[in-house]
Structure formats: C-alpha cells, structure tokens
C-alpha cells in the first residue's frame, strides 16, 4: 500500500546480484528473489529465508520484514541481512551493520527512515532434494497442536519448514499441514495427530518456487489480474485456537475466492530478531493469513473492509499486523 502523499520508488534500475563469496551475496534492492536464486543455487546455496513468491523484489520484502516457510527456523528475511546500504530522507547514502541503530530501524521500517538500496545476505547450503509431506487434520486445534510438536524437530534441523493451511471443502473446511524435510524419513512425523495423505520428493528449486504453478493457473483463468486483498496477522499462541476457530466460523469459501485459503504457520518469537517487526508477547505466535483470490472486482470490493474487521477483532486478543496487508491503515495502526 501507499500512504497519502507517499512516493513510489522504482528500483528496477538497481537489480544487480553480485558474486557469491563465503556464503554471502550482495544484492541491489531492485533484484527479485528469483534472480538471487539464479546466482546462488548453482553454488549449492540459498538465502536462509525466502518469501513464498520469488518475483517479489528484495527491497520491497525487506521494507516489511519478509515471512517465509523457513521463518520458524531462521527468522524473518530481514534476519538474514548482514549489512545494508540505504538513502535517508536527507538524501545521504548510509551504510550499517548489526549493532548499528540504523540497521535496526531500516529493516522492516517501511521506508520511513531510509530506502534500502543494497544488502548483503547470509546463505545456507541448499538440499538437492526435499520431501513434502502432507497431513490432513480433523480440526484446526489438532493442526495447531501438531505444529507445536514439530518445533523441536525444526530446531534440530530434522524438519526444514512447517506450514499449515485451511482449505474450503464443500460447506466446511479441511485443515492440512505441510512438513518439509531434506530426507525421506517417516519417523519425523511420529506422534502427530494428522493423517499422512501424500509425500512428494522434488528438487529444491521446485519447492522454493512452489507458488509458480498456482500463478500460472491464475493467469490462465484471468484471476491474476484481479486485486489480491490479503491479510496477514500474528496471533499470540495462547489465544490462537479460539481466534482461528472464531474467524473460520465467520468465513465462507466465497470470502476467499476459488483458489483462496487460510495459512497458519508457527513462529517462535526468539527466531525473529528484527526490532521493527512487531509480534505478540507470547513466546510462540501463529501467522494467520487470509489468502484471497476474488473471482471479480465486485467480489474484491468489500474485502479490505472485511480485513479491517478481522484485524480489529484479533488485535483485542494481543495480535499484531504484518503491514503488507490490504486495508486502509491509520497513523495509529
């Protein structure tokens, strides 16, 4: 979104991706994550955290923080930044690193202090093959409980990513959980309440680019050209079960659109080390994301107001907002 009287910075002319040196890469803010991967993956390395959509720009992602499937292990995308350069409101080029005040107010700072122009990113080894396990749950409470059980396995590295979703199923909802590993190890699912329904081995890039098949479908049906009024909030874990159940009771499939879903992902507060990215006070929070793909502009029109209503309800229970959300925000927000 854009504030009243705001400025759009076109960074397309600053999209260079530098050489990979000692598990680091210097990237200009206008580059896309797809372009970053094109430089790092042939070296067997990837950024520790990537957004689900690889065609987002690096600078745009870092302005809001950046949440991805690996956030539960490695934090926000901004937590993978090891140095940055930006232009302040005074027109000065400023460079900063961890420990500098500027470093902490620019990352996820919404461009209020400086516009990021160049960053250095930490890289991690990329698995050759990943295994995507899909589990189906009887209700949201058991899905959230399984996510909590998997946190220790995430820390140990036995699990690379955990992402829950709730998809429309007739007049009801089907909760499902995606567990991603770098080895075919059924034992990693031991003790979970969800019923395994599929396991799919795939190249690392196919998993990182998993949003691409959906985008192709949306483009083919014309839905990609419609507005995408998404909402992302962070729920305190202690209230998550009740909050999610309450919002699902209010939602219908048409509120999300034919390809929409609700995304639920666990985020340990300690994993996120970006001060400007606001999270609830609980040690664990749950990313609650309404992924809306309306069938028409008429269907999309009421969705920003509906997003506002959802946010106002969950905020009373201690939830916080991820600012890359579609509704009109005030200075108080």
Language model regions located:
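N-terminal glycine-rich flavin-associated loop
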Residues: 9-99, 123-146
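Active-site-adjacent structural patch at catalytic or cofactor/ligand-binding sites
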Residues: 8-10, 188-194, 288-293
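Short glycine-rich, acidic/polar surface loops and turns
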Residues: 70, 162-169, 270-280
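Short acidic-glycine loop/turn motifs at beta-strand connectors
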Residues: 4, 20-22, 87-90, 168-171, ...
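Conserved glycine-rich FAD pyrophosphate-binding loop
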Residues: 4, 197-333
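Hydrophobic N-terminal alpha-helices or hydrophobic patches in metabolic proteins across all domains
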Residues: 2-4, 12-14, 38, 48-51, ...
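Short, glycine-/Ser/Thr-/acidic-enriched flexible segments
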Residues: 14, 32, 63, 69, ...
């Amino acid at each position: 979104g854009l504030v009243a009287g705001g400025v759009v910075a076109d960074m397309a002319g600053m999209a260079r991706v530098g050489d990979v040196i000692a598990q680091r890469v210097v990237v200009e803010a206008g580059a896309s994550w797809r372009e970053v991967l094109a430089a790092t993956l042939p070296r067997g390395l990837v950024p520790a955290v990537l957004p689900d959509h690889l065609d987002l720009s690096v600078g745009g992602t870092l302005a809001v923080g950046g949440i991805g499937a690996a956030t539960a292990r490695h934090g926000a995308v901004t937590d993978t930044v090891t140095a940055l350069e930006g232009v302040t409101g005074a027109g000065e080029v400023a460079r900063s690193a961890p420990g500098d005040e500027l470093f902490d107010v620019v990352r996820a700072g919404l461009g209020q202090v400086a516009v990021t122009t160049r960053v250095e990113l930490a890289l991690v080894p990329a698995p050759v093959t990943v295994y995507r396990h899909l589990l189906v749950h009887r209700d949201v409470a058991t899905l959230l409980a399984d996510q909590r059980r998997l946190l220790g396995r995430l820390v140990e590295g036995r699990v690379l990513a955990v992402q829950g979703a709730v998809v429309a199923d007739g007049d009801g909802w089907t909760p499902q959980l995606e567990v991603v590993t770098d080895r075919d190890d059924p034992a990693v699912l031991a003790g979970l309440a969800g019923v395994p329904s599929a396991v799919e081995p795939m190249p690392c890039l196919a998993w990182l680019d998993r949003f691409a098949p959906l985008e192709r479908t949306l483009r083919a049906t014309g839905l990609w050209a419609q507005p995408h009024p998404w909402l992302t909030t962070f729920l305190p874990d202690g209230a998550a079960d009740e909050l999610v159940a309450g919002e699902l009771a209010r939602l219908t499939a048409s509120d999300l659109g034919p390809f929409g879903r609700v995304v639920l992902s666990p985020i340990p507060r300690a994993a996120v080390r970006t001060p400007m990215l606001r999270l609830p006070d609980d040690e664990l929070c749950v990313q609650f994301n309404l992924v809306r793909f309306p069938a028409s502009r008429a269907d999309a029109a009421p969705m920003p107001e509906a997003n506002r209503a959802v946010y106002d309800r969950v905020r009373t229970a201690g939830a916080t907002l991820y600012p890359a959300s579609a509704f009109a925000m005030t200075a108080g927000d």
